[in-house]
């Protein structure tokens, strides 16, 4: 099991911790650059404009000023990091090429401010990041070399993995990240469920699964924000988040490249599972930036039970 917050013998800063993970210097630098960018994003969240930017993204969604500002912060940090060749953002229409030479470089897919519509009611939001070696972003998430999210809540926490377990860092009063949890692990099953989407639009299989969870006494915990809901399941080590196929949206709502792959990577690294109901999220082949998929993510046994209810829906 992962250690509880404060159980480490001394505070460990993020850069020093990364250097102990036996990863490349370029990857250490990239992760630290993203962590630095998050300090400017949280400042924007706390003090920025809550109005509408007057533009829309690739999906036709109206962009909030905070979305645009957060995207600009992250994109510029990545562009000038010196270790990134391609960038894809949920707020951009196409892949942005920083350099045509991918040697020793990384490609980054990110959602700069997931759940930004929750900021004006003061609920938690977050940044989600997936990192790939080389210049190919349209490959299965299984090939990622790292993933992370930063949660902007009552505390600012950063959760990351480079394939060596899941670690949580928390921003202190000096705006530096210090290690608070090591080797975070999921339990086999749990009693929390976070169901997204309008229930009256659930398919019969998904409705039956929700009733199963209710009958066994699982507690409903859903904030409307993907990052805080996943963080709750991961840090408590129990439960399942689901945003299923809906009758009018067979591919669900969440984006494979920007949201699902990074979270699936982190949950699997913690001993959990993530599926679209038919196959692991990390084994899906992205066909474009705008690809969406249903998701069931959390404890292995809870995810396996969901697939049992969906058996036959994959044909």
Curated annotation (Swiss-Prot):
Parts forming coiled coils: none
Keyword tags: Carbohydrate metabolism, Cytoplasm, Hydrolase, Magnesium, Metal-binding
Pathway: Carbohydrate biosynthesis; gluconeogenesis
Organism whose genome encodes this protein: Trichlorobacter lovleyi (strain ATCC BAA-1151 / DSM 17278 / SZ) (Geobacter lovleyi)
Entry EC no(s): 3.1.3.11
Sites where the protein binds Mg(2+) 2: 111, 114, 259
GO molecular function: fructose 1,6-bisphosphate 1-phosphatase activity; magnesium ion binding
Highest taxon listed in the record's lineage: Bacteria
Keyword Nucleus part of the UniProt annotation: no
Protein name: Fructose-1,6-bisphosphatase class 1
Subcellular location: Cytoplasm
InterPro entries membership: FBPase_C_dom, FBPase_class-1, FBPase_N, FBPtase, Fructose_bisphosphatase_AS, SBPase
Binding site for substrate: 114-117, 222, 253
Cofactor notes: Binds 2 magnesium ions per subunit.
Calcium in keyword set: no
A single Gene Ontology CC term: cytosol
Gene3D superfamilies registered for this protein in UniProt: 3.40.190.80, Fructose-1,6-Bisphosphatase, subunit A, domain 1 (3.30.540.10)
Assembly behavior: Homotetramer.
Cofactor(s) it depends on: Mg(2+)
Catalytic activity of the protein: beta-D-fructose 1,6-bisphosphate + H2O = beta-D-fructose 6-phosphate + phosphate
Name of a matching Pfam family: FBPase_C
Entries under SUPFAM superfamilies matching the protein: Carbohydrate phosphatase (SSF56655)
Residues that coordinate or bind Mg(2+) 1: 90, 111, 113
GO BP terms in the entry: fructose 1,6-bisphosphate metabolic process; fructose 6-phosphate metabolic process; fructose metabolic process; gluconeogenesis; sucrose biosynthetic process
């Amino acid at each position: 099991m992962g250690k509880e917050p404060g159980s480490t013998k001394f505070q460990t800063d993020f850069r020093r911790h990364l250097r102990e993970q036996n990863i490349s210097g370029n990857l250490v630098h990239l992760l630290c650059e993203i962590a630095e960018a998050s300090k400017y994003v949280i400042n924007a969240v706390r003090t920025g404009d809550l109005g509408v930017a007057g533009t829309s993204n690739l999906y036709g969604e109206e962009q909030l000023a905070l979305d645009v500002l957060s995207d600009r912060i992250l994109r510029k940090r990545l562009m000038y990091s010196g270790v990134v060749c391609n960038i894809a953002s949920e707020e951009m229409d196409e892949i942005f090429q920083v350099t045509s030479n991918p040697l020793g470089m990384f490609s980054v897919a990110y959602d700069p401010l997931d759940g930004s519509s929750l900021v004006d009611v003061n609920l938690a939001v977050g940044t989600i990041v997936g990192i790939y070696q080389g210049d190919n972003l349209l490959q299965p998430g299984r090939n990622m070399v790292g993933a992370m999210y930063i949660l902007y809540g009552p505390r600012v926490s950063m959760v990351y993995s480079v394939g060596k377990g899941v670690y949580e860092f928390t921003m202190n009063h000096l705006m530096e990240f210090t290690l608070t949890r090591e080797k975070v692990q999921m339990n086999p099953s749990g009693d929390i469920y976070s169901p997204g989407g309008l229930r009256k639009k659930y398919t019969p299989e998904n409705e039956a699964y929700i009733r199963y969870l209710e009958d066994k006494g699982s507690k409903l915990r859903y904030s409307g924000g993907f990052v805080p809901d996943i963080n709750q399941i991961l840090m408590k080590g129990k439960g399942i988040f689901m945003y299923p196929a809906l009758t009018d949206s067979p591919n669900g709502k969440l984006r494979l490249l920007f949201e699902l792959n990074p979270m699936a990577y982190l949950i699997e690294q913690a001993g959990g599972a993530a599926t679209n109901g038919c196959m692991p999220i990390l084994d899906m082949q992205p066909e474009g930036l705008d690809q969406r998929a249903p998701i069931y993510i959390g404890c292995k046994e809870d995810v396996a039970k969901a697939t049992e209810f969906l058996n036959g829906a994959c044909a």
